[in-house]
């Protein structure tokens, strides 16, 4: 409650200039030059403005939808390699949003929903592809980890919390959320594996697949606007998930063996098999590209769930050369990001070619793919980023192979053009 009488006319009863209610009939009366407005009229004005904005918002749909070629070009700016996956994703995403813009069935033909399944090793770019597409289309995007999801009634995260997160990303604007993209990672971890005694999830993950089924296919999810139990009497928001694009991703370790068994590819499985080298890695990628729905069923996904993910794209494992490109070529490449950080201190950061190769080699040996690059670069530059704000006159820092291998610190170049190797001494 505000103090309504301290408006310069302490003995006079004040009224809202819009609705005529007195200061005693409203919670707050705001004074202006010879005019007063109550909190109820302010709220009414806000409602009117919100409604007008909502009426204008659908007109955005008339904006030109990027073609598959344009989507692919945008992906090329941020993601290295994975050409086949980019093409599959670009077409699927284009068709999805074309379907939303032409929701009225033509000649009785109703377009089905094309959710996407991405199969590829850790650090190959699955999450980045989904995130980059959402950014290029300017639609809300959220991520979920399938391993944290449970059926209703189990301890864990309810599948409808995914929609809650999407709503949060667009300030609970339902219309915006219904044009969004949801990426569910580690989807292979909820596969049904009855032959694995270590599985402790409910019904070996099948229950979670069943819970996700309706959400992915399309249902009207009732979501509390502020997150559930804290406000039990609030009205629920109704979100139509049939308009949301779901992209599921997973490494699917061992899936190539399932495919080989079906296709009778004699690549050598068992104790007598040869140790896999670079050639075998290419063979694994080629084998995964031949995946069929029946292989995914045998792997542990239920047929109904696979049916809701009709578009399948496989990603190849990144080699050392690709990791070097990832470090320097994309618009938001790691080296460019750290260079921007150093520029804020007035320092130029240079990564020499041998340093990039050494970083890529280290990431390959850790088997983390592109995902492990940031932690490696962060470790290399930690001491330098700690010291530089306190050192006067540094204009350039140089990172070479010896720095990556821990044999020396980055070379610091000062204004007087003396090149000094930063010693570890205090």
Curated annotation (Swiss-Prot):
Residues that hold Zn(2+) according to the record: 16, 19, 38, 41
ClpX-type ZB domain location: 4-57
Taxonomic superkingdom: Bacteria
Pfam family, one: AAA_2
Gene Ontology cellular-component terms listed: HslUV protease complex
UniProt: ATP binding residues: 121-128
GO MF terms, alphabetically ordered: ATP binding; ATP hydrolysis activity; ATP-dependent protein folding chaperone; protein dimerization activity; unfolded protein binding; zinc ion binding
InterPro entries reported in the protein's UniProt record: AAA+_ATPase, ATP-dep_Clp_protease_ClpX, ATPase_AAA_core, Clp_ATPase_C, Clp_protease_ATP-bd_su_ClpX, ClpX_bact, P-loop_NTPase, Znf_CppX_C4
Keywords, alphabetical: ATP-binding, Chaperone, Metal-binding, Nucleotide-binding, Zinc
UniProt xrefs under SMART domains: AAA (SM00382), ClpB_D2-small (SM01086), zf-C4_ClpX (SM00994)
An annotated GO BP: proteolysis involved in protein catabolic process
Listed PROSITE patterns: CLPX_ZB
Coiled-coil segments on the chain, per record: none
Metal-binding as UniProt keyword: yes
CDD domains reported for this sequence: RecA-like_ClpX
Subunit structure: Component of the ClpX-ClpP complex. Forms a hexameric ring that, in the presence of ATP, binds to fourteen ClpP subunits assembled into a disk-like structure with a central cavity, resembling the structure of eukaryotic proteasomes.
Stated family: Belongs to the ClpX chaperone family.
Stated role: ATP-dependent specificity component of the Clp protease. It directs the protease to specific substrates. Can perform chaperone functions in the absence of ClpP.
The protein, known as: ATP-dependent Clp protease ATP-binding subunit ClpX
């Amino acid at each position: 409650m505000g103090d309504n009488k301290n408006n310069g006319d302490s003995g006079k009863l004040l009224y809202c200039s819009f609705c005529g209610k007195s200061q005693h009939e409203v919670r707050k009366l705001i004074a202006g030059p010879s005019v007063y407005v109550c909190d109820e009229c302010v709220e009414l004005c806000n409602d009117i403005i919100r409604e007008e904005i909502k009426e204008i918002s659908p007109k955005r749909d008339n904006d030109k939808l990027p073609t598959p070629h344009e989507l692919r070009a945008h992906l090329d700016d941020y993601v290295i390699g994975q050409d086949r996956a980019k093409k599959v994703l670009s077409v699927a995403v284009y068709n999805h949003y074309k379907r939303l813009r032409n929701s009225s069935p033509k000649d009785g033909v109703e377009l089905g929903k094309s959710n996407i399944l991405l199969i590829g090793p850790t650090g190959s770019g699955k999450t980045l592809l989904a995130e980059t597409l959402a950014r290029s289309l300017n639609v809300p995007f959220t991520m979920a980890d399938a391993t944290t999801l449970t059926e209703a009634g189990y301890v864990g995260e309810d599948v409808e919390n995914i929609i809650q997160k999407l709503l949060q990303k667009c300030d609970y604007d339902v219309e915006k959320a219904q044009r969004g993209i949801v990426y569910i990672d580690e989807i292979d971890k909820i596969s049904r594996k009855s032959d694995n005694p270590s599985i402790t999830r409910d019904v070996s993950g099948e229950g979670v697949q069943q819970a996700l089924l309706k959400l992915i296919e399309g249902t009207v999810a009732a979501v509390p606007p502020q997150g559930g139990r804290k406000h039990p009497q609030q009205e629920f928001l109704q979100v139509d998930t049939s308009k949301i694009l779901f992209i599921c991703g997973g490494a699917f370790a061992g899936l190539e063996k399932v495919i080989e068994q079906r296709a009778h590819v004699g690549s050598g499985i068992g104790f007598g098999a040869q140790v896999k080298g670079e050639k075998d890695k290419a063979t694994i990628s080629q084998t995964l590209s031949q995946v069929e729905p029946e292989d995914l069923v045998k792997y542990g996904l239920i047929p109904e769930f696979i049916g809701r993910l009709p578009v399948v794209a496989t990603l190849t494992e990144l080699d050392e050369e690709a990791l070097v490109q990832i470090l320097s070529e994309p618009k938001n490449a790691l080296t460019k990001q750290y260079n921007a950080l150093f520029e804020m201190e007035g320092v130029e950061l240079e990564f020499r070619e041998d340093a990039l190769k050494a970083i890529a080699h280290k990431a390959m040996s850790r088997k983390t793919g592109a995902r492990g690059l940031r932690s490696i670069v962060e470790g290399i530059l930690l001491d330098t980023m700690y010291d530089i704000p306190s050192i006067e006159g540094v204009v350039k820092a140089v990172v070479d192979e010896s720095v990556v291998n821990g044999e020396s610190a980055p070379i610091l170049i000062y204004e007087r053009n003396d090149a000094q190797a930063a010693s570890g001494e205090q």
